[in-house]
Amino acid sequence: MKSLQKGFTLIELMIVVAIIGILAAFAIPAYNDYIARSQAAEGVSLADGLKVRIAENLQDGECKGPDADPASGVVGNKDTGKYALAEIDGTYDASKTAAGDPNGCKVNITYGQGTAADKISKLITGKKLVLDQLVNGSFIQGDGTDLADKFIPNAVKAKK
């Protein structure tokens, strides 16, 4: 009687392992970029949260109001998130009136200074995204940004 052997040969298993290794070589860097982009987006969310504070400061004719003072009820000009710190900066320019002009107010976002700074992607740690606020209230990437272009969210990316 002839016995039938069923299963995979060693060479077939080695080929499968090699294919998985090749796929992983492409997938891991792409996944790391995806994580860095998602963490970078948190900074823009923090900046959006500062829009109300900027508007309140602009009523006094300035971008950056007083530092936080809980005793007097003054809210500060910075927000800390999980991966980033966003701070209001700049000098208000009242002469700018067109909706697409920067009004002089900026938000500086520094990555790696959040509450979970040890968990941030090494691709964006210590990098800075500067956002200029436009007269219409939206943000656009400003000068002084050293965050790699591929990690800057499209909503604020400067047109080139």
Swiss-Prot record:
UniProt keyword terms in alphabetical order: Fimbrium, Membrane, Methylation, Transmembrane, Transmembrane helix
Regions crossing the membrane: 8-28
InterPro entries, per database record: N_methyl_site (IPR012902), Pilin (IPR001082), Pilin-like (IPR045584), T4P/T2SS_Core (IPR050470)
Pfam families for this protein: N_methyl, Pilin
Record localization: Fimbrium; Membrane
Chain positions listed as propeptide in the UniProt record: 1-7
Record-level GO cellular component terms: membrane; pilus
Residues modified to N-methylphenylalanine: 8
UniProt record, GO biological process: cell adhesion
Domain of life the protein comes from: Bacteria
Parts forming coiled coils: none
Keyword Cytoplasm: no
Membrane topology type: Single-pass membrane protein
Family in the record: Belongs to the N-Me-Phe pilin family.
Oligomeric form and interacting partners: The pili are polar flexible filaments of about 5.4 nanometers diameter and 2.5 micrometers average length; they consist of only a single polypeptide chain arranged in a helical configuration of five subunits per turn in the assembled pilus.
Name of the featured protein: Fimbrial protein
Organism name: Dichelobacter nodosus
